[in-house]
Amino acid sequence: MYAILDIESTGGKYNDEGITEIAIYKFDGHEVVDQFISLVNPERKIQSFVVGLTGINNDMLRHAPKFYEVAKRIVEITEGCILVAHNAKFDYRMLRLEFDRLGYAYERKTLCTVKLSKKLLPGFDSYSLGKLVKNLGIPITDRHRASGDALATVKLFKMLLDKDTDKSIISSNLKLNSISSVYQKLIKQIDQLPNAVGIYYFADH
């Protein structure tokens, strides 16, 4: 089972962003069997260039649910699923970032349709979602909105599944994303390091 998703964010400093919209389509390989689409109040300002790109502004999100209010639904709809996204590294990072703020370690296997497309559909000048689906004749509406991009990714992924007849390429591109508790602790410590140039002393207590 697959959870095909797209996330829109506030933009801004790396790992200081917030999710503004999320769309998840639960896909059994043939059809969508469940879906979740929601605006999200990121509790931080959206960068102006992102407003221009997505059309999502701060006023639209003022009364939207905060991430903790939709977190349970996200866990439930993705439980036992492989997360699929166009540039999955970004979407998965954003989910993990929001869950980490809640003190929850969110882990799922992931597949990236950018990487899969380059292997199964070689020869295109661009593998951006908009240009790729246009070249493939896949309709896309509401570009740069979560539901429109995620639904186009569903159609693209179905095409990729059909191309990979023995599923060997998809299997070889599956990322397990299992992070040990020790590594998670180190990542948190690294994130807390100051950005200023200087000499720092590390003590092992």
Task: Identify what each model region corresponds to.
Residues 1-108, 122-144:
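Conserved non-catalytic scaffold segment of RNase H-like nuclease domains
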Residues 104, 111, 195:
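Structured loop/turn residues at beta-strand edges in well-structured enzyme cores
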Residues 57, 68, 112-175:
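Extended, hydrophobic interaction surfaces within ordered domains
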Residues 151-205:
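GIY-YIG nuclease catalytic motif and its immediate N-terminal context
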